């Protein structure tokens, strides 16, 4: 189901930490002091600095409206959550529908508005693509609801471990390294390099891969 496309420019594990992924160019260097500052700000949820000063326009989206779209479309559902309708196929990217992008729902960054369509009203999805495992891109609650209405989940290397832990059928998970590709019907999806990092806690930094995508 997967293949290498073009010349390989894959990630190499760093020598002193062979279980971690690295960027090909500039590395992010953070100290424990940096991590503490970020974590403190994350959980305190500094609304004064982050809250928009104007209302964000949100147009409700219904299943009937999606069905009526005759041409290829890109529909932004909030933050990085994006629904693609391509050749009558539905592909959802980085689904985050929970109230907060956080390991718990009683604290952490809170969304500014509800998604224009609910998880339950989404059509059957041909694929879900995940870019990396940060909480604002990989949402456990959303995955648990979506897992039975998605044909395939496409992730960077080792991100699939989260999905399988949350009950997604292992046969539905495709993990790709940079420059590997897979197909959904006639649509080719290629994992490409990105400059970032990964992790969902204090001690799992860069243990999963991150990627941009060409579709």
Where are each of the predicted segments found?
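Catalytic core of the metallo-beta-lactamase
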Residues: 85, 183-215
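Active-site environment of divalent metal-dependent phosphoester hydrolases
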Residues: 134-138, 160-162, 180-183, 198-199
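Active-site metal-binding motif and surrounding structural segment of the metallo-beta-lactamase
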Residues: 27, 34, 107-154
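Helix-loop-beta element that forms the nucleotide-linked donor phosphate-binding surface
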Residues: 163-177
């Amino acid at each position: 189901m997967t293949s290498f496309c073009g010349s390989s420019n894959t990630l190499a594990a760093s020598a002193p930490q062979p279980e971690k992924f690295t960027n090909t160019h500039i590395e992010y260097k953070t100290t424990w002091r940096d991590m503490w500052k970020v974590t403190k700000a994350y959980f305190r949820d500094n609304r004064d600095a982050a809250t928009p000063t104007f209302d964000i326009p949100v147009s409700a989206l219904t299943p009937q409206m999606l069905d009526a779209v005759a041409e290829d479309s890109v529909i932004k559902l909030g933050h990085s959550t994006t629904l693609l309708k391509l050749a009558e196929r539905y592909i959802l990217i980085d689904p985050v529908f929970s109230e907060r992008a956080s390991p718990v729902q009683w604290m952490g960054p809170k969304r500014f508005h509800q998604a224009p369509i609910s998880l339950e009203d989404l059509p059957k999805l041909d694929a879900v693509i995940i870019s990396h495992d940060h909480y604002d891109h990989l949402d456990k609650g959303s995955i648990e609801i979506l897992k039975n209405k998605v044909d395939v989940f496409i992730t960077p290397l080792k991100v699939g471990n989260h999905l399988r832990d949350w009950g997604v059928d292992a046969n539905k998970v495709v993990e790709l390294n940079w420059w590997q590709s897979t197909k959904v019907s006639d649509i080719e999806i290629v994992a490409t390099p990105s400059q970032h990092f990964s992790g969902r806690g204090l001690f799992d930094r860069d243990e999963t891969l991150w990627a941009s995508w060409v579709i």
